[in-house]
Swiss-Prot record:
SUPFAM superfamilies: C-terminal UvrC-binding domain of UvrB, P-loop containing nucleoside triphosphate hydrolases. The gene is uvrB. PROSITE patterns: HELICASE_ATP_BIND_1, HELICASE_CTER, UVR. Keywords: ATP-binding, Cytoplasm, DNA damage, DNA excision, DNA repair, Excision nuclease, Helicase, Hydrolase, Nucleotide-binding, SOS response. Its main location: cytoplasm. Residues 24-195 form the Helicase ATP-binding domain. It comes from Kosmotoga olearia (strain ATCC BAA-1733 / DSM 21960 / TBF 19.5.1). GO terms for cellular component: cytoplasm; excinuclease repair complex. It comes from the Bacteria. GO terms for biological process: nucleotide-excision repair; SOS response. The beta-hairpin motif is involved in DNA binding. This is UvrABC system protein B. Residues 428-581 form the Helicase C-terminal domain.
Amino acid sequence: MRFNLKAPFEPRGDQPEAITRLVEGLRRGDRFQTLLGVTGSGKTFTMASIIERVQQPALVISPNKALVAQLYREFRSFFPENRVELFISYYDYYQPEAYIPTKDLYIEKDADINDLLARMRISALKSVLTRKDVVVVASVSAIYASGDPRDFQELNISLEIGQRIPRNELALKLASIQYSRSEDISSGGVFHLRGDVVEIFPPYEDYGIRIYFFDDEIERIISFDPMNRKTLEEFDRIIIYPAKEFVTTEEKIKHAVKEIERDLELRAKELEKNGKYLEAQRLKQRTLYDLEMLTTLGYCSGIENYSRYFDGRKPGEPPYTILDYFDKSEMIVFLDESHITVPQIRAMYHGDHSRKKNLVEYGFRLPSAFDNRPLTFEEFLESVGQIIFVSATPGDYELSVSTQIVEQLIRPTGLIDPEVVVKPTQNQVDDFIEEVQKVIERGERALVTVLTKKAAEMFSAYLNELGIRAEYLHSELDTVERVEVLKKLREGSVDVVVGVNLLREGLDLPEVSLVAIMDADKEGFLRSETTLIQTIGRAARNINGKVLLYADRITNSMKRAIEETNRRRMKQLMYNIEHDIKPESIVKPLYENIFEEFADNEEKIEIAKNTYLDGILALKEDLEAEEYLALLEEEMWRASSELRYEDAAMLRDEMLRIKRETKKDNI
């Protein structure tokens, strides 16, 4: 089936030219292009239009779950007749395995899998393998391991009318590709045997399959609604794909066990040779237990650490990911919010490797654990075809590699970028209160950014004392609490949100007409050019948008951010005059789950980051001062590039503390 874009409007403003130029670039064979699109300019519609024009499968990667949910919903509305799939981590809760030597603390892996998200991942894999009209909207989970696409495609069951196959044999085949015999159909991946009928519930479909037998011959194949059991469609032939993302054969398990036994012997000898007898004994005990489980059950806890044995990969070779399910020569990749997504992809491998280093060195895991990992950035680039970076503030990398930078600065709604006003820091709080009162009188909302978590808490408390309904937002609030604060702001039960890094939320708040940036002249992570432009953009969805920069001097970052905002503002104003457009605020329905849809899943990231940061700080005792400082600096810049400014600030403070201690010791 061909992509068929459905929308109640045609491309407007800069969209027609942007679509044409980017499509020409794809057809020309350009490897990298950038769509520089401002907030509210319709970047998602532009991406959808490009997909329809070129008729190629697409992978859209976005940096957080809130944006993924938003994009998934929008692409589904644009392509109701085609397959739009979602591919994010399937964990509701995730505690990664880790070991902190200084505390002799082993943290066991703990996880809860969300059945719905697991089924959606399988649906995505199946769609990519079997269709051309597919858009997959993914998080950075796209660079983490998935099953071998050859196994997923080859280990299917083909059934057709007239085929002879005993029902018990069919049941065994279904079990071999991870279907279980059960009456509970809520999670999919199950089947029933009822007399001459076999009912199968694939996890990737919202309907069941019913196979009618006459003796051992298939007589009829239908799909049916599991709720009312009504027949939906008749089939002559059907293919049943695996019920799980990771499937393998008994032969591969036997071969893997032999390989693991060989590597265990070699690694144990290596540890003993280095005098690490405790570590060698620990490794033998843990690995032999895993091998026993694999031999008897075909599964063990932490089986992913042995994935390269099942995949037949050599040490160091990249894992299979959803990228391997695509035809590289046909796919298009859109990196949404690329100024965040590119650094995020770069950082994933290093964080994973650092955590596993201790597990391997101290005998908790074989070195094969290193090969259950995300792709490196270079491997990611090798795995995909043409890339279009999408951002209002593309990073240096995107700008340097792109054949063309296509601007999309005109908003179809006529909304102009907010007016930016610089005011002195003296009496900045009183001035803001005066400004926010006007906003509240109009029934609108405000955002304020400050430099520290303590300042956010104190400022919000002070506003509440004055009768202004305010809440604070920072990294110590868990995902559910952050979701609730933003929901209150949109509903109107809160007028002001005070935050430190308001970029992490993927905010889309048309009710916000005022953004205030306190101490805007304090150069650093939170006041860089990119951060300022992105924060200014938070007021760009409201006709009364205004931004206050409280500063006693104009920094270079402020100057560039103001100049760029004014350039975009003037272009929109000229367009509005030329086309007689009257600006209108964006009206966006308050979806109950706009931020909540995958909120619980976000815990995985929070927990992984916290464990990893604890691990970095715990390395102080194991490293020389210079090595420790170098590691802290590397991780600080990585956190900054991912816009995790609070983590970056914590690492910076630790660096300064170590430098002060070193200076004292040298006196």
